[in-house]
Amino acid sequence: MGLRKLKNIKHGGKTLTEILESHQRFFRGQEGGVRADLTGADISHADLREINLSGAILRNTNFEQSDLRKAKLPGADLSGAKLGKADLRNADLTEAILPGADLSEAQASGIEFFRCDLSNVNFQNAKLRNVNLRLANVHGAKFSGADMGVAILRETDLTGADLSGVDLTTTLMPKGYAGAQAKIKGA
């Protein structure tokens, strides 16, 4: 089964295409624009490549197994969103809000997570190669089994994060990091 098209997905009586057009007008400051609020929407198995949802309200939205490659989501509120097995490669989530989101088994390599709230996010078994987690809040986040090769964790407080089973040999860690801040296999 292929990915669903935007015109075939409805939320609140409107198609996703209509919601996105209105959001683009809002984002540009044009008349008639409305910030996208897709709280609780089912947008799973959808083709959302290069979509611009900057600043959108996406709380508890189901994006499972959707294609979000190169999506623009800076400042978006993805609290509690379901992104398991989604493809988020090279998406921009700068300053996005994701507490409690599920990104388990997501393909999330190359993501910009700069200054994100990633508290209590489930990253278990996710592919997080070349991600930037500088200044992100990762308290309570579960990274166990994730592939974090060449990830940037500089200036990130890892207190309370679960990094068990993660190979950190090529990961750029915070200066002076000793491993006691986070749960690490063998630490």
Task: Walk through the language-model features, giving the residues of each.
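Long, contiguous interaction/recruitment modules in multidomain scaffold/adaptor proteins
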Residues: M1-G2
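Tandem repeat scaffolds
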Residues: K5-E18, Q24, R28-A187
